[in-house]
Swiss-Prot record:
SMART domains: AAA. The gene is znuC. Its main location: membrane. Belongs to the ABC transporter superfamily. Zinc importer (TC 3.A.1.15.5) family. The lineage of its organism: Bacteria, Pseudomonadati, Pseudomonadota, Gammaproteobacteria, Chromatiales. It is an enzyme of class 7 (translocase). This is Zinc import ATP-binding protein ZnuC.
Amino acid sequence: MFGLIHNPPHAGRLPAAATTLVEARGLTVRRGDQPVLCNVDLVVESGQVVTLVGPNGSGKSTLVQVLTGVIRDYRGQVGRRTGLRVGYVPQHFRIDRNLPITVRRFMKLAPRGRRGHWAEAVADAGVSQLLDRPMQGLSGGELRRVLLARALLSRPHLLALDEPAAGLDQRGQGELYRLIRHVRDRYGCGVLVVSHDLNLVMAATDQVLCLSEGHILCRGAPESVRAHPEYRALFGAHLGPETAVFPHAHGPGEGCTHG
């Protein structure tokens, strides 16, 4: 079943394939007189990895918040599968150093209904050896894995990750993206990744959407987006011969088109 999150009176029900998790059509968000998202179309399906790239302020995080139901004030149509379970890993997570807490205690603070998969989530995220460590003493990569484990407690259909590789070195990025691929394959979930840099896009990405000032400039496989004139005009000053996209295995897919 595919349930409508929000539907203006004049709009019809969104059709959806059995594998569709979330879908947006003509999505527009404004803050006062300022547009944040403009006429965005997007579909995320089970087992698919979709990455949103763009500079700061391009609307990436707002789009994720609308798709996951956090923001409900918008125009256009957004639908999601009935009973959709969402796991979210934020970019920033503040830990109060005056309130020491172990990883084990942090994991068990989850809502009671989500504790049934506690051991499984801990194992899948690779944090079993961290359970007795204080949260305040974790490295950036360790903290990301703990937050991922917590997001897995609900066995999500959709996993949303906001800048998961930010602040990690190259080795840490590779380890994190391998872990995300493992989770995607094991759970069969869709994955929505936010990034400001196409060069950090994970190898398993099926589709990249490049946003700027709330508009989709282009979309497609990582290589096609990186070669697109709109993308190069936006990031060209930062592109050089040393930059490269992670190796990408992709079957026949759509090329880069204007949103």
